[in-house]
Amino acid sequence: QIQQHLPHLVAIHQHSFLNLKQIQFKTAFDVVLCIDAAYHSNLNSFLASVCTVLNAKGRLGFHYLILSEQWSALTTLQKQKYKWLLKSADVNLDDLMTQSVLTQTLQRYDFSEIEVVDLSKAVLHGFSHYIQQLPQPQIGLDAVKIQITAKLCHKLYVDGLVQYVQISAKKNAP
């Protein structure tokens, strides 16, 4: 469907971002995008995979969850509650980090021009608000999952301890 609307794109590949090395691409890519998925994996695993297919000076864009600076003030019990909540959304809390650690991690993988934009209001609040505005709750397992996800998004947004961010960065030339 994307290629119908953007016919000038030569190829669009849909695949697990953790196994990119196994795909035999003819050339490396100028741009790699991972939309609303990378936070389900360890950042180091994601970056290691992406670096195998990204050109020198190539651009990377992805979404991730980060911990706010207030995170360190939480008690062990409060952190454990978040760990359980995030696990329900297939997110491993141990993989999340603050923005400064995320930036350092990208730099270790030889990225620069790193931009981090907080999209928590648009994504977390926006999704939960949208679901709350629907006329009647739907019936079925999928509807229940959507309702639970909306409640989790609302909690994350209101508490402000976990942020939904968009990251862009440029790979340095060797």
Residue ranges and their predicted role:
Residues N44-R59:
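A short glycine-rich, Lys/Arg-flanked "PGG" loop and its adjoining helix->strand segment in the class I
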Residues R59-L86:
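Conserved class I S-adenosyl-L-methionine
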Residues D30-N44:
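A short SAM/SAH-binding and catalytic strip from SAM-dependent methyltransferases
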Residues L85-V101:
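Acceptor-substrate binding/catalytic loop of class I
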Residues S100-L119:
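A SAM-dependent methyltransferase catalytic signature shared across enzymes that methylate proteins
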